[in-house]
Structure formats: structure tokens, C-alpha cells
Swiss-Prot record:
EC number: 2.-.-.-
Membrane topology category: Multi-pass membrane protein
Free-text function comment from the UniProt entry: There are several lipid A forms in this strain, including a phosphoethanolamine (1-O-P-pEtN) form; overexpression of this gene does not lead to higher levels of the 1-O-P-pEtN form of lipid A.
GO-annotated molecular function: phosphotransferase activity, phosphate group as acceptor
One GO CC term on file: plasma membrane
InterPro entries, A to Z: Alkaline_phosphatase_core_sf, PEA_transferase, Sulfatase_N
One GO term of the biological process aspect: lipopolysaccharide core region biosynthetic process
Periplasmic side: 1-60, 132-141, 286-541
Topological domains, Cytoplasmic: 82-110, 163-264
Protein name (database record): Putative transferase YhbX
Length: 541
């Protein structure tokens, strides 16, 4: 019998096994990192062969279940990241997943049903391969020894890597060991979750750190500062910036009271990094979570302000996330479950407290986070049809505008000011199932271009700057802008809003979802353009 005939006979008998190996290999080569591919493939094949030789069906299924589910989940995550963002999964995505609350995860899963189907298909495929006991395959002893050799070699290599890391950093990290070992297994993406868990522990260790600042405090004539952080807001969908639909009538009605930033850009296209960049001393080029304690809340506290953090983004995992490490420093924190308007009663209560004391009140909105159709009450919809994604997104913008109008109404008779900006923008591609989505690798300008303005109460008169700023200004410098806005600065910082803007305008460096730094100006304007700025075939017409 020729080699070809032997192979054909083997393929006919074990075609599901061959198919699963091919699917596993191609998926990991295309949508995941190719690192340690030989070890991962051997681990996958040998595990299947070992399990198939377990004679007891209940025991075989018990052993197979975690392997099958983890492998299918890992591959589905890789496919999601590659197909949606054009990049492999990484620790930044893992951090975002770990910092998402269950409600948000459930909503997002509903949007990405193809990847749930991929998970189900892969699980069934691998289970179909494993479920049949097959005596024609090599014995458990042979495959078990080979699998043990692969695991031992991988563990030894991971230990070597962790030892070198510990030697360089003078500290051993079990997360580094776990992360490295995962790269040799079919569960490659677990390495990113191990790194995210390491970041979580680092955040826990520094969250309670309160630095002492040498502060310069000046009287701005303002007693109440309301900082509103929007979520996933596109400038291109706001009539304030020229959009054809009237999505921002309340803000436009206040145009004479507003200092508008026409070219504000976010430092990153996802919340877990963009918000800390905006509210702390962290920076695009020198990202380090040890910068997080140097934040606007700690500065305001030391300056004698009463501080509040009111959020409609779930309190799930309140400790150990980037945003909550800042929020927890506020004197009062409130998390509501529901639509953004539920924050308004808490804002009213905060305004009534200690009326003689200066206040910084932060409202962290759910805004236009995907899925936008769930971001507002259906009774608030003004654009139809309500199941159209563009209408839903525009309704979410209109809903936020309505909330801003109510905030202005609460503050119009006070010596108050409101700063509003969005954490990041969103991409738009009408050819995709989910038209709006976060920026990924080498995101377009739309993922970064955000709305930003400062509203001043009419009570403050004409002594404040309401001119329009047309230069690029990165929200990565908003901590300095907010400090100057409050009149609470460090000696080495620009002291006034004008000084901050003059000093940092034009700095257009941004980081993408792959942690690579780009010049915003050089990015394609829209997602549907290629990297040279030409419309793609799908984006034409």
C-alpha cells in the first residue's frame, strides 16, 4: 500500500480529526499570533488523541468539556478581534473585557452573534471528534507521554522566561509565568487575560495612593464645576458640528454660552485607556498606571473642593479598574443602573450640599455605547425607524443632548460651569452587520475625533472665554485643562485655560488598540477609506 493510499484511508476514517486540526491551524495562523504554533498544534492534537482513548464516556466528556470550550472560546475571540478591528486580540482588549459589567457584556454578545455561532460550531466540531472512542489510534500511554513532554517543555520555557523577567524587575510575577505558558497552549489568548489580571493587581496596589501636591489655587469666580464624560460619541453625528439631522438642539441653543473645541481628539479609541489619559497625568508616549493617582479628583480634594462621581456605567468590579481607581477617590460616589437621566436627581442633591463649598461633580455617562438602540428610553426616540442603526445612534446623541439641556437648566442661576467631552469616537461602516464599532489597529480619525466644549452660566457674564478653538487639542491633556479650569494647578503646569491650550494645541499623537502610536493627522479620515485615504469599494457610493 502506497503512502498516499495509507493517508487516504486514514483521512477517510478520521476526517473529522483532520478537519479540526486544519480549522485550528488556519484560524490561529490568520486571526491569532503565530507564536509557538508548533507547540500549540501538538498540544491540541495530542490532547484530542489522549481523550479519544479514554474508554469511559462520562469521564471522556468530563475531561473533554473544559478543553473543548476553552479552545472554541479562544478561537472565537481571535476571529472577533481580527474580523472587527483588523488586529489580533491583545491585553488592551482583555482589560476592556475584564472591566465590562455583565449587562454590557450581554448587550455586546447580542450584537456579535456570528461569533457566538462560531463558538457553537467549533465546540460541536471538537466534541464530535472527541466523543467517539477509537482503538485504532495510538494508545493513551504513547500519546500521554508525548503530551507530557510537550507540556513539560513548555513549562520549562515559560519558567525560563519568568526567571529572566524577575531578574530584570527584581520581582517574580506568577502572572508572567501563566501568561507565557498560555502561549504554548491552544488557549493562547489566556496569556492576555493573565497580563490583564496582573494590571488589575497593580491597580489595586496603587488605587489608595494619594500623593501630596504643591498646589496653586486661584479664584476663578466659579463655585460649581460639572464635568461630563460622554461615551462613544461621534462628532460626525452631531448637528453642533454640522450634521444634517438636528441631534443637538439643546447645546446649540446655548451656543453663545459655550467655548467649543472643533478638533478635539481622544488619546485612545477605547475607554479603559482614554479616560485615564484624560483625567490623570498619564500620557500617550509614557503610559504608566503609576501616573493614575495624579488625577483631577485627588487635586480637587486637596484644594478643598467637595467631590462627587456620579456614573451610569455599572459599579461592577468597582476596585481594580482604571476608571474606578480614579472615581473611588471622590468624597461621594453614586452608580445608577439604567439610563443616564437617572443621574439628574443625584446631581440635584449634590448641588444642595454645602452651598458655600466649591464642588467638582463628575458625571460619567453611558452615552452612545453600543448597542446604541439600548442607550435611551424608546419613548425618547425622535428619529425613525427605531430598528435602524443610524437612527438609533442619532437618537442616543439626541438623548444625551436632552440630558445636557437639563443640566444647563439646573445650573443657569449659579456661578457654575460645565465641561463636556467624549472618551472616544466610533468607526462607521454601513456594509458591516454592526455599523458602529470601536477603533482597532490603525483606526481612522473618526475613532478619535470627539466633541468637547465648556459651558459657562449666564451669571458669570462676559468675563470668561467663550471663543471657538479650531486647533487640534488632545483630551490626553484634559487633566491640565481641567486643573486650569478649576484654578487648581501645580507650579510646573500652565496656569490658565488659554495657557494650556496654547502649550498643547497641535499635539496629535494617539495610540491604537494595538498599543502603537500614530499621528492623528496622518490617519485616514474614515474607516471606509484605505490607508492612503482612497474610498474602498465597499465604502463607495
Amino acid at each position: 500500500m502506497t503512502v498516499f493510499n495509507k493517508f487516504a484511508r486514514s483521512f477517510k476514517s478520521h476526517w473529522l480529526l483532520y478537519l479540526s486540526v486544519i480549522v485550528f491551524g488556519i484560524t490561529n495562523l490568520v486571526a491569532s499570533s503565530g507564536a509557538h504554533m508548533v507547540q500549540r498544534l501538538l498540544f491540541f492534537v495530542l490532547t484530542i488523541l489522549v481523550v479519544k482513548r479514554i474508554s469511559s464516556l462520562p469521564l471522556r466528556l468530563l475531561v473533554a468539556a473544559p478543553f473543548v470550550l476553552l479552545t472554541a472560546a479562544d478561537m472565537s475571540i481571535s476571529l472577533y478581534s481580527w474580523c472587527t478591528f483588523g488586529t489580533t486580540f491583545n491585553d488592551g482588549f482583555a482589560i476592556s473585557v475584564l472591566q465590562s459589567d455583565p449587562d454590557e457584556v450581554a448587550k455586546m454578545l447580542g450584537m456579535y452573534s456570528p461569533y457566538l455561532c462560531a463558538f457553537a460550531f467549533l465546540s460541536l466540531l471538537f466534541l464530535a471528534v472527541i466523543i467517539k472512542y477509537d482503538v485504532s489510534l495510538p494508545t493513551k500511554k504513547v500519546t500521554g507521554i508525548l503530551l507530557l513532554i510537550v507540556i513539560s517543555g513548555s513549562l520549562f520555557s515559560a519558567c525560563q522566561f519568568a526567571y529572566k523577567d524577575a531578574k530584570n524587575k527584581n520581582a517574580f510575577s506568577p502572572y508572567i509565568l501563566a501568561s507565557r505558558f498560555a502561549t504554548y497552549t491552544p488557549f493562547f489568548n489566556l496569556n492576555y487575560f493573565a497580563l490583564a489580571a496582573k494590571e488589575h493587581q497593580r491597580l489595586l496596589s496603587i488605587a489608595n495612593t494619594v500623593p501630596y501636591f504643591q498646589l496653586s489655587v486661584r479664584d476663578t469666580g466659579i463655585d460649581t464645576y460639572v464635568l461630563i464624560v460622554g461615551e462613544s460619541v461621534r462628532v460626525d453625528n452631531m448637528s453642533l458640528y454640522g450634521y444634517t439631522r438636528s441631534t443637538t438642539p439643546q447645546v446649540e441653543a446655548q451656543r453663545k454660552q459655550i467655548k467649543l473645541f472643533n478638533q478635539a481628539i481622544s488619546g485612545a479609541p477605547y475607554t479603559a485607556l482614554s479616560v485615564p489619559l484624560s483625567l490623570t497625568a498619564d500620557s500617550v508616549l509614557s503610559h504608566d498606571i503609576h501616573n493614575y493617582p495624579d488625577n483631577i479628583i485627588n487635586m480637587a480634594n486637596q484644594a478643598g473642593f467637595q467631590t462627587f462621581w456620579l456614573s451610569s456605567q455599572s459599579a461592577f468590579r468597582q476596585n481594580g479598574t482604571a476608571v474606578t481607581s480614579i472615581a473611588m477617590r471622590a468624597m461621594e460616589t453614586v452608580y445608577v443602573r439604567g439610563f443616564d437621566e437617572l443621574l439628574l436627581p443625584h446631581l440635584s442633591q449634590a448641588l444642595q450640599q454645602n452651598t458655600q463649598q466649591k464642588k467638582l461633580i463628575v458625571l460619567h455617562l453611558n452615552g452612545s455605547h453600543e448597542p446604541a438602540c439600548s442607550a435611551y428610553p424608546q419613548s425618547s426616540a425622535v428619529f425613525q425607524p427605531q430598528d435602524d442603526q443610524d437612527a438609533c445612534y442619532d437618537n442616543s446623541i439626541h438623548y444625551t443632548d436632552s440630558l445636557l439641556g437639563q443640566v444647563f437648566e439646573l445650573l443657569k442661576d449659579r456661578r457654575a460651569s460645565v465641561m463636556y467631552f467624549a472618551d472616544h469616537g466610533l468607526e462607521r461602516d454601513p456594509t458591516k452587520k454592526n455599523v458602529y464599532f470601536h477603533g482597532g489597529r490603525e483606526a481612522s480619525q473618526q475613532a478619535y475625533h470627539v466633541p468637547m466644549f465648556i459651558w459657562y452660566s449666564p451669571v458669570l457674564g462676559d468675563g470668561v472665554d467663550r471663543t471657538t478653538e479650531n486647533n487640534i487639542f488632545s483630551t490626553a491633556y484634559n487633566n491640565y485643562l481641567i486643573n486650569a479650569w478649576m484654578g487648581v494647578t501645580k507650579p510646573e503646569q500652565p496656569q490658565t485655560l488659554e495657557e494650556v491650550i496654547v502649550h498643547y494645541k497641535g499635539d496629535s499623537l494617539v495610540v491604537d488598540a494595538n498599543h502603537d502610536v500614530f499621528d492623528y493627522v496622518m490617519l485616514r479620515k474614515e474607516f471606509t477609506e484605505d490607508k492612503q485615504g482612497n474610498p474602498t469599494p465597499e465604502g463607495q457610493g
